[in-house]
Amino acid sequence: KLTAHKADQNGAPVYSYVFSWGTSYHTAEIPFVFNNIDKVSVSGDRDEAEKLSDIMSSAWINFAKTGNPNGDGIPDWEPYTRSNSAVMIFDNETYLVHNHEQELMSLLAPNYKY
């Protein structure tokens, strides 16, 4: 709901993501974003975790520098709009989906147009 609302404001582009690595919990993506997974215990394959950390930290660095997370080694990340509902999935594979979990979103906020 908040993502759609921010996209409607026509300010800076909005980039939405879901972190689905292993048994992820709230804030579990932080060590991946800052590329310091060696400082914490992470579930899953270590090589895959390092690969994901490289992708995520590159995207966040690109975004901090340019306002756009796209760059070498990162799947094309479209800004979120109501018409595309683009969401980047960060997991063993990193990929972009459109209209992610729309049925679930409709259940959570049935009167809101996503």
Regions found by a protein language model. Name each.
Residues 1-114:
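C-terminal helix-and-tail extensions that cap enzymatic domains
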